[in-house]
Amino acid sequence: MAYFPNIGKIAYEGPESRNPFAFKFYNPEEKVGGKTMEEHLRFSVAYWHTFTGDGSDPFGVGNMIRPWDKYSGMDLAKARVEAAFELFEKLNVPFFCFHDVDIAPEGETLSETYKNLDEIVDMIEEYMKTSKTKLLWNTANLFSHPRFVHGAATSCNADVFAYAAAKVKKGLEIAKRLGAENYVFWGGREGYETLLNTDMKLELDNLARFFHMAVDYAKEIGFDGQFLIEPKPKEPTKHQYDFDVATALAFLQTYGLKDYFKFNIEANHATLAGHTFEHELRVARIHGMLGSVDANQGDMLLGWDTDEFPTDLYATTLAMYEILQNGGLGRGGLNFDAKVRRGSFEPEDLFYAHIAGMDSFAIGLKVAHRLLEDRVFEQFIEERYKSYTEGIGREIVEGTADFHKLEQYALQLGEIRNTSGRLERLKTLLNQYLLEVSVPSKARL
């Protein structure tokens, strides 16, 4: 059956179109800097928000109207697969992502859970044979079930550690079977509420042991996808061990795991950590650890993970600025880890939301490309740090200066003069480039 019978394929119609079911800026075939938009952006649909989210929150029950909700159990799981590939085709997206429990219900035993997963993976595999949409990444849900109340790999209960390992083992087998580009680890319960009852050293050691086991098993079965860690500072756990990129990077370096992992950066998680989206992307990029992106945005007035669809053009531009400087995302992509608002409960809202996000990143791509092509910020930055290309600055950079030499130099200095950072000027330039790309020429006349 058709789950979205009144919606056709979403096509590019240009910025002057008033068709709500059309892309205004995302043209998958348009080339930007030698690559098509589709190749640059590598969009992905998040299975959990799009097909299992029901709109419930701590103050209200689910209210989403979904054509597949008349089913239950495995029939519901199968209907969601059918609806998913219909939406993928109509949006023309190249990728999707899922947790294990998104695609199939848990059974009474682990064996039953495996059986359910195998049946749905069979179905997904068949759909993928005739679909352009591939698996960007999958992961194991190690946070929802009560067994994970104290964590998974960091649980105080070794039985839980073993159960979590079994779920990831199965997840890696599914990843290999479906040709996943990546496999993600997000430690929603890997952290602590209070140090009064926590052996932090043991928990971190065990988390590292868990990751090493995953690396070993991936090698054993021949899964060559990229491993990704998704940092988040809190929620649901008060203090999570993968707080931000810098914290998670220190963990990977400490335990000899850096060569096996990169980061999946989520915009809203950066917000919760007190960072900008572009900050987390920059830290990952300069350390060679930028792997993939969960494309969403948070509400700056709220203190939790709101997972809104990305429509902030400054954020998408500065994100693409980092991604382009990274040479792209390689095997990663832009996954819409985003949900429609509770008040946007009709099926067509799923399309409006993805169109908005895809158009927003298309604008960001084009603006970022022009900024880099014109070297707008690079020229200013080079001039700002020019003192390190000559004289004493060059000696500092080349490692030929020491405290004795620097003291002698400083004693001969007169009054030190700095130059302006020109922040307001740079923001004006950013606005100018944004308007030139995003506002149709007729509207500017």
From Swiss-Prot:
Known catalytic reactions: alpha-D-xylose = alpha-D-xylulofuranose
EC number, UniProt record: 5.3.1.5
SUPFAM superfamilies documented for this protein: Xylose isomerase-like
Class of the enzyme per the UniProt entry, highest EC level: isomerase
Localization: Cytoplasm
Main location: cytoplasm
Positions bound to Mg(2+) 2: E266, H269, D305, D307
Active site: H99, D102
Any single GO CC term annotated in Swiss-Prot or TrEMBL for this entry: cytoplasm
Top-rank taxon, per record: Bacteria
Cofactor(s), names only, from the UniProt record: Mg(2+)
Gene3D superfamilies xrefs: Divalent-metal-dependent TIM barrel enzymes
Keyword field contains Isomerase: yes
Assembly and oligomerization: Homotetramer.
Family that this chain belongs to: Belongs to the xylose isomerase family.
Name of the molecule in the record: Xylose isomerase
